[in-house]
């Protein structure tokens, strides 16, 4: 069995070595999960709900431990990491109400009774990215477990620590052995085996659009169920009638949060031409005051990028001759630091405007009117999130209906609430996570007719 050295992105120092599973180990754990499914699906709804609530409670008890582990492994700010651990707790609590509410229906038919049942799929393979290791894991495993499935989860190779700890806490909560399994390993080994092993009945994948397409092709061989949350290049649209100062103050966090390593990052900033200079003045002040520092500091608003390789990739998007409007600050010394960077763009075909950089870089472009803003915003292969800033309620409704994105926010930059649906249009994904409808993605509907004339 090979190993991988986890690196602290804040210091570039090694943290610990993690054993990586091979194909044989992966198959063995998948088989274990398949065996556990037969008993887990038959745990009474009330008892399954109690176990999930207990799991949530134990995660809450370990919030600070999990948060500090994420700061160490991922470079997330301590404030964000606490929220992320809390989100796992909240998602578990939310879906703990589901086992007792997996309602079927009684459908009127002649000469009999027709009923439907919501039945679990079996083993669910959850493949988690490195940008939000804890919450995205929870978005997959919580509804899957609530619906009576078992889970095999592959954390990203570079950020496995919190997932491993969550699996330990699940056992502590009384979740039976084999029901929730974490398998550290390479995507080309463990992730690929999730796709090809017929015992895995569904894949939940969050990551790049390119890899998502490969997984989609692989799943087609077995008509394997699939949920995808992929790339984004979200638009932050500022109209002239907006609260300009408020919009500018919120814009840095909308794109630089988590060092821009967020599929929902508003990395395209569309500003109405008549207010461009005024907005940019407020925006520059906000960017220069954005606190990029040791993520363990309570005051930190942004930490480092995840790896040296990713830092090099982001650097490629901002060459020496790039049209930089202004930058924020960054620490000196070790670690994978990149200063918040604002680029002025005049061409929608500019590479920085079209491609997902996945770093603290935002491209600013102007628009003339409402129709122009909609056209520019929709000129993207992605459609995950976005913001609309306007005091005109009619305009806000019109634009929000016209923008091709799955998660929009008016006069704010929010994207995710665990009790509302989350997912993308176009090449940003397939299906929805979170909210009341996500559970349907982890069940099959069975229809049964009873002939009462027999």
Language model regions located:
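Conserved C-terminal structural/oligomerization subdomain of aldehyde/semialdehyde dehydrogenase
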Residues: 11-17, 200, 237, 291, ...
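ALDH superfamily catalytic-core signature
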Residues: 210-347, 410
């Amino acid at each position: 069995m090979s190993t991988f050295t986890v690196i602290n992105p804040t210091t570039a120092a090694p943290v610990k070595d993690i054993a990586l599973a091979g194909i044989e180990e992966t198959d063995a754990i998948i088989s274990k999960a398949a065996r556990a499914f037969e008993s887990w699906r038959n745990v009474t709804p009330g008892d399954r709900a109690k176990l999930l609530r207990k799991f949530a409670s134990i995660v809450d008890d370990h919030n600070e431990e999990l948060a500090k582990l994420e700061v160490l492994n991922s470079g997330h700010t301590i404030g964000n990491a606490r929220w992320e651990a809390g989100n796992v707790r909240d998602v578990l609590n939310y879906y703990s109400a589901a086992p007792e509410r997996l309602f079927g229906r009684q459908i009127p038919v002649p000469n009999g009774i027709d009923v439907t049942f919501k039945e679990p799929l079996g083993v669910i393979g959850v493949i988690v990215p490195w940008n939000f290791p804890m919450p995205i894991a929870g978005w997959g495993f919580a509804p899957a477990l609530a619906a009576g499935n078992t889970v095999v989860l592959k954390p990203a190779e570079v950020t496995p620590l919190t997932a491993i700890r969550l699996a330990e806490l699940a056992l502590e909560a009384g979740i039976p052995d084999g029901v929730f399994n974490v398998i550290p390993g390479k995507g080309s080994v463990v992730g690929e085996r999730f796709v090809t092993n017929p015992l895995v009945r569904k894949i939940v994948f969050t990551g790049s659009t390119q890899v998502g397409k490969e997984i989609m092709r692989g799943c087609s061989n077995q008509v394997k169920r699939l949920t995808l949350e992929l790339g984004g290049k979200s638009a932050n649209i500022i109209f002239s009638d907006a609260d300009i100062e408020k919009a500018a103050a919120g814009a840095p966090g909308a794109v630089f949060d988590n060092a821009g390593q967020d599929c929902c990052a508003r990395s395209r900033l569309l500003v109405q031409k008549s207010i461009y200079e005024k907005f940019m003045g407020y925006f520059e002040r906000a960017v220069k005051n954005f606190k990029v520092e040791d993520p363990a500091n309570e005051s930190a608003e942004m930490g480092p990028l995840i790896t040296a390789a990713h830092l090099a990739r982001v650097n490629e998007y901002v060459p020496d001759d790039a049209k930089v409007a202004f930058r924020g600050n960054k620490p000196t010394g070790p670690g994978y630091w990149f200063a918040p960077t604002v680029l002025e763009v005049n061409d929608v075909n500019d590479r920085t405007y079209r491609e997902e950089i996945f770093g603290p870089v935002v491209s600013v472009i102007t628009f003339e009117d409402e129709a122009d803003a909609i056209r520019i915003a929709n000129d993207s292969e992605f459609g995950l999130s976005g913001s609309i800033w306007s005091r005109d309620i009619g305009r806000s409704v019109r634009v929000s209906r016209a923008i091709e994105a799955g998660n929009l926010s008016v006069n704010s930059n929010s994207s995710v609430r665990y009790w509302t649906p989350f997912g993308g249009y176009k090449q940003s994904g397939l299906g929805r996570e979170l909210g009341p409808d996500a559970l349907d993605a982890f069940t099959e509907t069975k229809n049964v007719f009873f002939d009462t004339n027999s």
